[in-house]
UniProtKB/Swiss-Prot annotation:
PANTHER family: CALCIUM-BINDING MITOCHONDRIAL CARRIER PROTEIN ARALAR1, MITOCHONDRIAL 2-OXODICARBOXYLATE CARRIER 1-RELATED. Residues 71-104, 105-140, 142-175, 176-211 form the EF-hand domain. Residues 336-627 are annotated as: Carrier domain. Residues 364-405, 463-497, 555-593 are mitochondrial matrix. Mitochondrial electrogenic aspartate/glutamate antiporter that favors efflux of aspartate and entry of glutamate and proton within the mitochondria as part of the malate-aspartate shuttle. Also mediates the exchange of L-cysteinesulfinate (3-sulfino-L-alanine) for L-glutamate. Necessary for gamma-aminobutyric acid (GABA) uptake in brain mitochondria in response to increased mitochondrial membrane polarization; does not possess detectable GABA transport activity but role may be indirect. One of its GO terms (biological process) is aspartate transmembrane transport. Residues 311-327 are annotated as: Linker loop domain. This is Electrogenic aspartate/glutamate antiporter Aralar, mitochondrial. GO terms for molecular function: 3-sulfino-L-alanine: proton, glutamate antiporter activity; aspartate:glutamate, proton antiporter activity; calcium ion binding; gamma-aminobutyric acid:proton symporter activity; identical protein binding; L-aspartate transmembrane transporter activity; L-glutamate transmembrane transporter activity. It is found in: Mitochondrion inner membrane. Ca(2+) 1 binds at D84, S86, D88, L90, E95. Keywords: Calcium, Membrane, Metal-binding, Mitochondrion, Mitochondrion inner membrane, Repeat, Transmembrane, Transmembrane helix, Transport. It comes from Drosophila melanogaster. Belongs to the mitochondrial carrier (TC 2.A.29) family.
Amino acid sequence: MPMHIPFPFNWIPTLPVARCQESPSLLKRAGTEKLREVFLKYASIQKNGEHYMTSEDFVRKFLGLFSESAFNDESVRLLANIADTSKDGLISFSEFQAFEGLLCTPDALYRTAFQLFDRKGNGTVSYADFADVVQKTELHSKIPFSLDGPFIKRYFGDKKQRLINYAEFTQLLHDFHEEHAMEAFRSKDPAGTGFISPLDFQDIIVNVKRHLLTPGVRDNLVSVTEGHKVSFPYFIAFTSLLNNMELIKQVYLHATEGSRTDMITKDQILLAAQTMSQITPLEIDILFHLAGAVHQAGRIDYSDLSNIAPEHYTKHMTHRLAEIKAVESPADRSAFIQVLESSYRFTLGSFAGAVGATVVYPIDLVKTRMQNQRAGSYIGEVAYRNSWDCFKKVVRHEGFMGLYRGLLPQLMGVAPEKAIKLTVNDLVRDKLTDKKGNIPTWAEVLAGGCAGASQVVFTNPLEIVKIRLQVAGEIASGSKIRAWSVVRELGLFGLYKGARACLLRDVPFSAIYFPTYAHTKAMMADKDGYNHPLTLLAAGAIAGVPAASLVTPADVIKTRLQVVARSGQTTYTGVWDATKKIMAEEGPRAFWKGTAARVFRSSPQFGVTLVTYELLQRLFYVDFGGTQPKGSEAHKITTPLEQAAASVTTENVDHIGGYRAAVPLLAGVESKFGLYLPRFGRGVTAASPSTATGS
């Protein structure tokens, strides 16, 4: 008896989506002359001045299927008949072009299946047509379907003479597998007890519903029964659950208000499913039982549903300039790979930090001068009424470049400062994120705090040099000060003057900023979880408002400690001393000086920095087997034709227009409808899966 293996479509790689360019088509139609050129390249028959393709020309040479020498002739003819509407064994150019157009229609998957069954090419399916194709499938060879039963008679009539049109055929094809499953149950229960054994249950599901099974479900079909016999209601509920998994996912999203990470109980999903008459409590019981068999947990989240029935999706992402896969799987993450990942993040963070600092540096200069302005006046010192007045006077007295006084040392320090902050935050978040990708709020706050503490090593020397350069222009007759002269004057220990105040500012800032950014970013993602660059910019700016404003008192104290006090100005010995003296001499409002400037500087700076950092990770993508920024790609449920378009292979440049989706669509006929055709001819032993998959 011949051994069959599945029709070889599972090897097709997933490549970028072929977007719709002609409404309502998903694929742009090929030009007639270009299509004719491709047709003539493969057409091997010439009759009466016309060229034709044979079945082998079309299926084996053009589509690249059944490349083995011992291919199944009947399967090749069946597939060629889809395009051969005249059913004369030859494909003309007009038929070749017509099928290309069919592949561009929104319901191409069903129409392709219909033409597979329309053996006479008259636009209808007869009983003989249906029976002929069904009898050639692998499923029928393993679990025969009764072609004389009541199901067939309901569709084709008692005498089996009724013809089925396209619209009716789509329903027939949908109902066929459900009926086949019930008939298989009856065949395994000849005594009519209403029960079958666990092994028979496994055999039926693997054969009749294998196009709906994931490896995790397939491996647990026996264990989910707990060794008990399977009743007919349980069997029907199980098959219904597989069919309704997309509906189950919608129920879950309704129960969690759109969150894909919330863990929910059986009672919660039962409550949410009350409005869905298609879902029964028994199906929910099986769902949780199956999820427990797969990963041994009492509650489920969206990833558990995807493990049972993965979504067909396309990835919507920014164009990648480079893509590197450092490891094959997360299990291969060595210490060296993790160091490389941190180095990669540090490099991108440095560039992002420099970009962000340059954009907002004029605002930072205004903020610093406002914070350093003491109560009362000082001879020769420019007085500012507000931030806008400060901005105008800097431009008037020092020129436009005066707004960038001290930028160079700022860039030299801000690059590693922002890099270490972003890297440490990502590193700690990675360590505190569970296997499902969830991280508690306390862990987000801790990661941000660690990031803030780590940056002080770079921030304090940078800040003290920057501040002294920024305030140097306030004295009209003052000599020009260089960054290096400030460094030599302060020395190593002097560069860390005010470090306590710096910690007092940076730790709470980052502890507030990063969790706020992550949650705001998630809220601004679209329904598919994707963040447009503008939403990243907005999330970064919004998160900067509370973070920057709430730590302004610490920033004022740090500025006063690090600036050089002029003659007649109060000097401070430490954080507590500065706090007491500022309060006594200037009142509590002095602690909030420059708040507006700080918010207007920090919010856009971090917005620009974060959007640059995440976009760089999208553009220069490296998979280290760890976590990627959320929102960088969307897992969007697609239609069968979109799935086909997303799986287009570019190996054959002759697959143009609708033919770009030909092979994936034929795979869809197999995977969606379970119409697996034998690949090898009779008497040929099947090879292993790895060797059986051809090009």
